[in-house]
Amino acid sequence: MEKIELLAPAGNLRILKAAVDSGADAVYCGLTVFNARINAENLTLGQFEEGVDYAHARSSRVYLTVNTLVSDMERDDLFDTVSKACEAGADGLIVQDIAVLKMLREAFPDVRINASTQMNIYSRDQFKELFKLGVNRVVLPRELSMDEISSRVHLAARYGIDCEVFAHGAVCVCASGLCLFSAMNKAGTRSGNRGTCAQPCREEYKLYNGGLRLRAGHLLSPKDRDVSDYLARLIETGVASLKLEGRMRDENYVRSAVRAYRTLIDAYYDGYLDDTLLNEIKRDLLINFNRGGSYTAQYLSGRKDDNILSGEYPGKYGYSLGKISRMDVKKGTVTISLGKHPVIPSKGDYLSIRNDKNELCSFPVGKLHEMPHEIAVKGLHPDAIQKLKPGLSVFIMNHATEQDRAELRRTPVRFNLYFNDTDVTLDATVISGPNADITAAATLEIPSDYEGAPLDEERIRTQLSKTLDTAFYPDEINIYGETKSCPISLINGLRREVLSSIEKEITTSYKRTARPLSDDVSDAGLTTADKTKLTMFTYPVIRQNMDIISEGADIYCYSIYDMAVKELRDHVIAFAEKTDTKIAVFLPDFSHDLLEKIIDKVLASLKSDAGERFYAVISSRLLSDKAFIKGLGVKDFISAGANIYSSKSAEIALGYCDGLFMSHEVDADELVNNALDVFPADKTLIVQSEGMIPWMQSDFCVCGQNKKHCDTCSKVGVFELQQKDRMGASVLAVPHSIDCSCTLYGPAKNLVTEDLISTLSYGNFSLIINHTYLPEVKDGETVY
């Protein structure tokens, strides 16, 4: 049985090698451009090739992250960069942008293409189109339950696509690929979709209902994820790869996380994975890094986790060691009474001493003395010791790990040694793994004047086994022919030469060259052909006040959450009939399978009741099966959540839909140029002219905190979320009762002005000008 892949992060070359050594089957890393962790150290092209060769020699793979949105101007630079990485031997490319995906699939037909979680492949009906695009793997959203993962794994397998699941590490409170919080907030220069997320979710906020403050603190900061309790089920489901997050974290973190999951995976396949081992590994992981003192499995159970937030300590929390029992200022010692499951720190490990609210001090352990149920440690300055008192909590913040050289990951080979009359030949063959059956051989003559005794076979085996400083280990040694009298240095020389040759054979086998790209020409252009210019008013929430709908538009767009309520649905249909206007419905850019069934029923009911006034469905489901939408006889428009960022991605996307929003991150002038370049006459461009836009779409409800039966959103339609320092814009939080999710709305920075709309009128396409209206919260009351 082929084992599930363990995929590790690497923020630099040193960590890449550490991850491989520790047992990672594959490593993902980025270069200094075009990746979603651009603030990591990352690798130069030279370092990348060195890392790829190092990994391949040890039967590990390397995936290059190209998981950002890419502009038209950057396209050539990206292609040159990826070409050099593939020439260096990259095994696969992790991609977000659909235009990048198509370009790289064409240029590198033999390189794996992995659809990043940033592509937000959440619905079950997208795998057919992904297969047509040449995708080999989908990185599934972190928000899925075990049942949802299982159904997607089996559907993907029909098309030869495998699935990857995040196993451990930091998580975003927003569904992947849908967060504009960093890109739009404050200066608005740090985009998560462009690799420079400022992590505003880790900051402090206040939540208001009108002028009434409901709660304050780190309201958007989730704990780290850990799926160790679900490991067996994930393997049995058929998941191909378990991914560890952490390209911004240090070598010790990566080494520890890889070793922990390597132990668990091997234990499962060897039949000894049990609760005792799981608890031991969890403790090691908690020491390595956690937020809030524990982990979350998010939604794997199928239920909302109401303990998902990190609490008021959003950084590295540590592992509880015990409490201070006494101090000795003269000796410079702090004595700690150990807790139930203690870990004895080593010299150099950091300890943190805290009261109920804050860290008081931290220090590296110097000397340590163990006693029954206690330890006395040195390392803290006497002046700092004087400020402490018994009863304060002590946490261990890290625990340095060492690894025996014999335990490092290596490639198994079979040695065959042949003694002939005048020479000795050694060949080596890789026994298993991705490099199986690669062979190398070398022959050296026996010195004619050598007069030593014939070599002992055991001595020969010992010398051939001296491979600790290489990427290989001999799993099998065969000796043929009568052993001859020859210097032991000859055997050592053969071993070195053969292993050097086989390593070169392995690394060379991965080098590739790019195919030339085709030069697609768009048929868009300026025209005076018939086209439409319509105005659309979008109302993300009307359930608390249906009177907010005002006349003046051609199309009125409402949330599927509101349209699921018959009273609201009847009201908007009556308004459309009264004003002779049309109705559009926008769907969430992420949803669970249960909501999918509700969506279909609601859309069918709306079509039945509204008839031809039901004009369009707006969603991010670019690659989904469109049969149901077509059957309704309505327009299929794509939302900004699909992240259509360039003219190339727009050109591709228009092949799947009737019209679209470009990404809200696209500069308004650039948006106009892109549209004039590629939009044909039978398509529609939708532009944002006024109002707020979705900054974050989350399966976690910041209003109700995922509490069961909270009933928060039945009373209030919108809440205000404000940063503690008031430096950022006020954000409106709209909770959704059907699935207990939440959308945060904030100001748009790339609104399309009247002048630009006039320029767009020269295009060959229809135009919809959108205005979004949300409640304005003032002075303790909600004003519409």
Where are the language model's segments positioned?
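Surface-exposed amphipathic alpha-helical tracts and adjacent flexible/coil segments at the periphery
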Residues: 1-21, 26-33, 37, 49-52, ...
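Glycine-rich, highly charged phosphate/nucleotide-binding loops
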Residues: 43-48
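Conserved phosphate-binding/catalytic loop of the ribokinase/pfkB sugar-kinase fold
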Residues: 119-123
